[in-house]
């Protein structure tokens, strides 16, 4: 079974531009992403990274991975946090593809709920 990993990089705009060009050329040649990662996220400095992966958001990722909540509401209950705050954090993490949100509907339910999933085996941070 293939390991699914993503990489987070801290780099300047110039380094980012150079990486985009390099990645584009590698992709055109059919070569895999750097280090065979499925996703590479880049941030200009540590302050950006600390906003995206704050301690609370890391706790969300860990709870999704370990407890596999069926909805954002259930995740909020596991965390002991307000559902609205958890929902914002979950949507931000999903925007960066760190977690996935799947629409699900239980038998007998009228409306769909969003089921958060963490489908990575791990991630690396390069500073």
Where do the protein language model's features map onto the residues?
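Key DNA-contact positions within bacterial/archaeal DNA-binding proteins
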Residues: 84-85
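Short, cationic-aromatic polyanion-contact patches
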Residues: 47-56, 71, 104-127
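Short amphipathic alpha-helical interface segments
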Residues: 55-68
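General nucleic-acid-binding
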Residues: 1-30
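Short alpha-helical segments that sit at the start of domains
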Residues: 32-58
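Residues within the DNA-recognition helix of helix-turn-helix
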Residues: 89
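A short, conserved structural fragment
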Residues: 97-104
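A short acidic, leucine-rich amphipathic alpha-helix
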Residues: 74-80, 93
């Amino acid at each position: 079974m293939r390991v699914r990993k993503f990489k987070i990089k801290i780099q300047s705009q110039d380094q980012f531009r150079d990486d985009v060009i390099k990645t584009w050329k590698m992709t055109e040649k059919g070569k895999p992403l750097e280090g065979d990662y499925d996703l590479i996220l880049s941030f200009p400095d540590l302050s950006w990274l600390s906003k995206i992966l704050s301690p609370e958001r890391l706790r969300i990722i860990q709870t999704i991975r370990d407890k596999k909540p069926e909805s954002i509401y259930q995740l909020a209950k596991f965390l002991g946090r307000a559902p609205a705050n958890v929902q914002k954090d979950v949507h931000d993490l999903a925007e960066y593809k760190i977690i996935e949100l799947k629409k699900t509907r239980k038998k007998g339910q009228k409306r769909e709920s969003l089921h958060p999933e963490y489908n990575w085996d791990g991630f690396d941070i390069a500073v």
